[in-house]
Design a protein with these regions (language model features):
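Conserved alpha/beta core of the MobA/IspD/sugar-nucleotide pyrophosphorylase nucleotidyltransferase superfamily
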Residues: 2-7, 160-194
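Nucleotide and nucleotide-moiety/phosphate-recognizing core
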Residues: 4-144, 176-182
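A short acidic, helix-capping loop that chelates divalent metal ions and anchors anionic groups
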Residues: 20-24, 157-158, 188
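Short beta-strand-to-turn element immediately C-terminal to the catalytic PLP-Schiff-base lysine
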Residues: 29-31, 149-151, 191-192
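Conserved nucleotide-sugar donor-binding
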Residues: 102, 143-157
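Short, glycine/charged-rich beta-strand-loop motifs at protein surfaces that mediate ligand recognition
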Residues: 111-113, 155-162
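A residue-level structural signature of the nucleotidyltransferase/glycosyltransferase Rossmann-like core
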Residues: 112, 146-149, 188-189
Length: 194
């Protein structure tokens, strides 16, 4: 729950890929201080009020072992078809989200270790009035980025709209997702190289 009277929002961490450009699965990547990106992503979503947090793993299923024992309310979602691309990961994660009582989900890839919880909170707050029909994404300098919030009423359509390594961007654009400027909080940059 996001606290107070706000509707429940679950978090999704997309971490199933092989990380070809990175040189290995980003689910196994760590900050210079040794903090796993996976742990950072889960804690960021939890700090923003997301519960549960679903972690989609495929190429590196053992990455779940990197999560500290003190992190509660995390569900590992296996993605056996991870090699089919981002679409397989979104299908698995949104399918798992359907078993929660969440009205919406916040989606982040594991390769945005700099993402602050404040950006997640801002996107959640901006989309809250729409409830299950919410559709929003952070923007940085006018460019779309993460996090992305998808209301429950969109989950099936989003899952049907993605294929291969094509994510939900086209769906978000076609359905006029609310653009939430977050460039005052962070650069929006993902990490593609070690």
């Amino acid at each position: 729950m996001t606290g107070g009277d706000e509707p429940p929002v679950c978090g999704i961490v997309l971490a199933a890929g092989a990380g070809r450009r990175y040189g290995g699965p980003k689910a196994l990547a760590r900050d210079p201080d040794g903090t796993p990106w996976l742990t950072r992503a889960v804690r960021t979503l939890q700090s923003a009020g997301c519960s549960p947090v679903l972690v989609a793993l495929g190429a590196a299923p053992d990455a779940a072992d990197l999560l500290p024992a003190d992190i509660a309310d995390v569900v590992v979602v296996p993605v056996p078809e991870w090699a089919d691309g981002l679409a397989a990961t979104l299908h698995a994660a949104l399918g798992a989200a359907a078993s929660t009582d969440a009205e919406s989900t916040v989606v982040v890839p594991v390769d945005v270790p700099g993402l602050p919880a404040s950006a997640v909170r801002r996107v959640i707050a901006a989309a809250a009035p729409a409830g299950v029909d919410g559709l929003a994404r952070a923007t940085y300098g006018g460019d779309p980025g993460h996090p992305v919030l998808i209301g429950r009423s969109h989950w099936a359509e989003v899952a049907a709209s993605v294929s291969g390594d094509r994510g939900a961007g086209a769906y978000l654009a076609a359905h006029a997702a609310l653009a939430v400027p977050c460039d005052d909080l962070w650069s929006g940059a993902d990490v593609d190289t070690p």
